[in-house]
From Swiss-Prot:
Subunit structure: PSII is composed of 1 copy each of membrane proteins PsbA, PsbB, PsbC, PsbD, PsbE, PsbF, PsbH, PsbI, PsbJ, PsbK, PsbL, PsbM, PsbT, PsbX, PsbY, PsbZ, Psb30/Ycf12, at least 3 peripheral proteins of the oxygen-evolving complex and a large number of cofactors. It forms dimeric complexes.
Keywords assigned by UniProt, alphabetized: Chlorophyll, Chloroplast, Chromophore, Membrane, Photosynthesis, Photosystem II, Plastid, Thylakoid, Transmembrane, Transmembrane helix
Name used for this protein in its record: Photosystem II CP47 reaction center protein
Any Gene Ontology CC annotation: photosystem II
Alphabetized Pfam families for the sequence: PSII
Alphabetical list of SUPFAM superfamilies matching this protein: Photosystem II antenna protein-like
Textual note on the cofactor: Binds multiple chlorophylls. PSII binds additional chlorophylls, carotenoids and specific lipids.
Matching Gene3D superfamilies: Photosystem II CP47 reaction center protein
Tagged with keyword Manganese: no
Function: One of the components of the core complex of photosystem II (PSII). It binds chlorophyll and helps catalyze the primary light-induced photochemical processes of PSII. PSII is a light-driven water:plastoquinone oxidoreductase, using light energy to abstract electrons from H(2)O, generating O(2) and a proton gradient subsequently used for ATP formation.
Similarity-based family: Belongs to the PsbB/PsbC family. PsbB subfamily.
Single GO term (MF): chlorophyll binding
Length: 508
């Protein structure tokens, strides 16, 4: 039977043993990829600077997911939070990677076994002796088991009752660590940034899954519903499974792009909205204001700003700045951050403090404009010098640094002032090493951007797949071209493989 490539899956349509086999093989491939990718990332990951060169700057994709579930140590003697360790235990990054590879190998062998021994008694209807699956019962079994796993994750792993807990941090991504989390049963549990909601929702959803699974195991569907939804057809299972997957993909794309407790910025990088709203800038200025209120000097107040917080307030860490098709990590774009130069404060010759307008997310170039505290333009870097009124030279702008490596240093040379004004458009100013990785200076997206793009793309594709297979299973008789005046009764569903000449025909 010669099948075109897009119809090859029909070979497992009426073959439960080999249908199981190909799904086990799929699990083997997924687990094998995860373990192999983890080992590759561990081979290239540099854990030496968790502040200025964190995992998301280095383009790590699977390490953040392991970390948020409680893995922080490596058999190489390092910890993701910095420093060294002597005993990382079995469940290190390498241990998790190895477990996935072992699982992959076992699933590979199981898939081969089920492919060879496909005709098992368990798949046969004892009354007819033909291949048959009790799909509503199988649905109940899967629902029950997934409910147990969901409940167990929320009640034991996340809470730390039997497990490490999960990664929890403050709203500004400064104090993150793995810790146990108590379930949040009140209204606060519905806040996407409250970690307790992860525990409570898994416990609640798991309980619901267990009860629903028991219901479907003990109650048979009504005949009309069974026939109306084509519950005896394996393509119905495919359609509804695709629906579950694309719905989940849309949900996680949203929680990743907009941010939530499940996607900490220390592991996946900041969101674009934190740049758009000046989220970190506002916190920095709040801290400076608090320092000045305690009679600290500007220099002292800025010196107490954590370098980690300042680094978040840099446009190069905005996942929307990198093009979707620019390959490579953020470090391959603008370089590896080496140090914070400090916060530049610009003043004109009258002593007014000036603020550089920051570049919006979707601009590649942006005019350098300096405004005063009231938003009035006082200086700029003009495009045409002949018509300039507010040039740095004419206005006499100077710059002084507070905090960072240039703390206390000031410049009045117009060329230097303009250089730092241009860099201040991009947020806090950092020294970046572009030589080490031969970085090209073009911004890249973070794993947050890749994950979102990938999951939205596949969700749209799977949405189409759900509609396609749902329509096929609901309207199979229509698509098969059955003539209402057909004089031969054809038993559809008993034999569905393409080109099968043995379908029973019986005169009416």
């Amino acid at each position: 039977m010669g099948l075109p490539w897009y119809r090859v899956h029909t070979v497992v349509l009426n073959d439960p043993g080999r249908l199981l086999s190909v799904h086990i093989m799929h699990t083997a491939l997924v687990a094998g990829w995860a373990g192999s990718m983890a080992l590759y990332e561990l081979a290239v990951f540099d854990p030496s600077d968790p502040v200025l060169d964190p995992m998301w700057r280095q383009g790590m994709f699977v390490i953040p997911f392991m970390t948020r579930l409680g893995i922080t140590n490596s058999w190489g003697g390092w910890s993701i939070t910095g420093g060294t360790i002597t005993n990382s235990g079995i469940w290190s990054y390498e241990g998790v990677a190895g477990a996935h590879i072992v699982l992959s190998g076992l699933c590979f062998l199981a898939a081969i076994w089920h492919w060879v021994y496909w005709d098992l008694e368990i798949f046969s209807d004892e009354r007819t002796g033909k291949p048959s699956l009790d799909l509503p019962k199988i649905f109940g079994i899967h629902l029950f088991l997934s409910g147990v796993a969901c409940f167990g994750f929320g009640a034991f792993h996340v809470t730390g009752l039997y497990g490490p807990g999960i990664w929890v941090s403050d709203p500004y991504g400064l104090t993150g660590r793995v810790q146990s989390v108590n379930p949040a049963w009140g209204v606060g549990g519905f806040d996407p940034f409250v970690p307790g909601g992860i525990a409570s929702h898994h416990i609640a959803a798991g309980t619901l899954g267990i009860l629903a699974g028991l219901f479907h195991l003990s109650v048979r569907p009504p005949q009309r519903l069974y026939k109306g939804l084509r519950m005896g057809n394996i393509e119905t299972v495919l359609s509804s499974s695709i629906a579950a997957v694309f719905f989940a993909a849309f949900v996680v794309a949203g929680t990743m792009w907009y941010g939530s407790a499940t996607t900490p910025i220390e592991l996946f990088g900041p969101t674009r909205y934190q740049w758009d709203q000046g989220y970190f800038q506002q916190e920095i200025y709040r801290r400076i204001g608090a320092g000045l209120a305690e009679n600290q000097s500007l220099s002292e107040a800025w010196s107490k700003i954590p370098e980690k917080l300042a680094f978040y307030d840099y446009i190069g860490n905005n996942p929307a700045k990198g093009g979707l098709f620019r390959a490579g990590s953020m470090d391959n774009g603008d370089g590896i951050a080496v140090g914070w130069l400090g916060h530049p404060v610009f003043r004109d010759k009258e002593g007014r403090e000036l603020f550089v307008r920051r570049m919006p997310t979707f601009f590649e170039t942006f005019p350098v404009v300096l405004v005063d505290g009231d938003g009035i333009v006082r200086a700029d870097v003009p495009f045409r010098r002949a018509e300039s009124k507010y040039s740095v030279e004419q206005v006499g702008v100077t710059v002084e640094f507070y905090g960072g490596e240039l703390n206390g240093v000031s410049y009045s040379d117009p060329a230097t002032v303009k250089k730092y004004a241009r860099r201040a458009q991009l947020g806090e100013i950092f020294e970046l090493d572009r030589a080490a990785l031969k970085s090209d200076g073009v911004f890249r997206s973070s794993p947050r951007g890749w994950f979102t793009f990938g999951h939205v793309s596949f969700a749209l594709l799977f949405f189409f797949g759900h509609i396609w297979h749902g329509a096929r299973t609901l309207f199979r008789d229509v698509f098969a071209g059955i003539d209402p005046d057909l004089d031969a009764q054809v038993e559809f569903g008993a034999f569905q493989k393409l080109g099968d000449p043995t379908t029973k025909r019986q005169a009416v």
